[in-house]
Each structure stands twice: as C-alpha cells, then as structure tokens.
C-alpha cells in the first residue's frame, strides 16, 4: 500500500504579492486561520518555499512557490483506529460525507474510547494509506441517522463550519412526532439552555442560547406526523427540545417525550439527503 502525502495547499507568488510576509499570504490568499498556521508551522514540512522550510516572517519573491501542509494525522492525540462499518457516500481530498447509522456515537468519550465513528474513520484512513485527520463538521445525536460531513484537515473544518449557518450549508431532517403540529408549517424560535443539575438534558430557557428551527408537516397518520425540519442554529438536542416545547415530542424520545420500546427503540430522527 502506498501512503498518501498529507494534504497541501500551494501558491505561486505573483509580482503584486512579492515582498509580503508569508503569514500575510497564508491568511489572505489561502484563507488559513491563525490557529491552523500556528499548528503547522512547527512541522518539518509545514511551510515550504520552493521546497525549503521557511518561517512565516519570510518575504518571498515573484515566481516562488509557497506550499503549506494542512493535514496533521499525528496530531490526533489518543484516537484509537478501530475497524467498524462505514457508509461513505462522497469523498475527496478535503472531506468525507457518511451515512451515519443510529446507535453510533461520533466522538470518543467516557465508556466509548474505541467504538465511535471517529475511531472507524481513523481505521479506514490507516488501512487505505490516507494521511488525513478526523474532524466532524456538525453534530448528530447517538440515536440520529443520516448524513454527516467530516473534514480531513483543520482548514477544511474551519471553512465548512463557517458555512454551517449560511444558505450554502442546509441541514434538513425528517422526524416522526407525537400528535399533529398546528399550524402545519412554522418556525420555533426559542432559546435553549441546560437543565440545572443534568449533564445531558436541555430545555427552553429565556437565558439560553438563541435557537431557531423551521418545520413542515409532510404526512400524518395514527395520531403522528412525519415532519421536515431545518436548523437555522445548531444547539445540542435542538430539534428534540423544540418539538417537545410545542407539545409534539419525537416518537420514541426517552428524554423529552415517552419511551415506547414496543414501538421503536430509538428517537425517530434522520438527516435528509436532499433539500426541498
């Protein structure tokens, strides 16, 4: 297996750019943040000018080629590569789009250090010889299934996160809720905060973070509704909290509604693959 080289960005310095500090060129022309620059400048091959390592204070001449490494697989800390199922629907040099299965955590944490989606992705990179990082762009709860975007390096993560709350990045979900919302289409604009004394639960709280969810009823039957929901913000448990707030908790939601194992063993929430 051939190990791929870490992702790099290149810039051929023009006459107008000649004499400017490399730090300035990285920020303005390649749109790298100070955080990414500080992270890569200490790598032996982090910032190169015509193939030679340079500092960010260097001032290149016209025609020279500036190259910066944006992926740092060795900077993933104690991430344990673990074999596990992955449903990859799109991949390029900067990102993955995966279809996340329900019941799978995204990030390692207490009690789950090696059985999360990040562990499975790290294993996939290792076996495929891909020199990339694992940076999920958005959050999906353990019980939620659907599409998840994962950046392969910090620069891609920053660029994609910058699009999260813009029209360029739409997050649309399908869910089944208890009862039939009235009106059948609307916007739930209610701030969300932690429930005092709970590490997990959230609630509508006037002192919480602003949160906005748009909903549209698609179909009804047996006292329930299939609802399309689009997030304008991205708070923890936002859809679940907002739907419970208007009196229509998601079917099977043990935390904000009523858990019914005779019907379903998880909350019925799925990220939709296509916008309306």
Spell out what each predicted region is.
Residues 1-272, 276:
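RNA pseudouridine synthases
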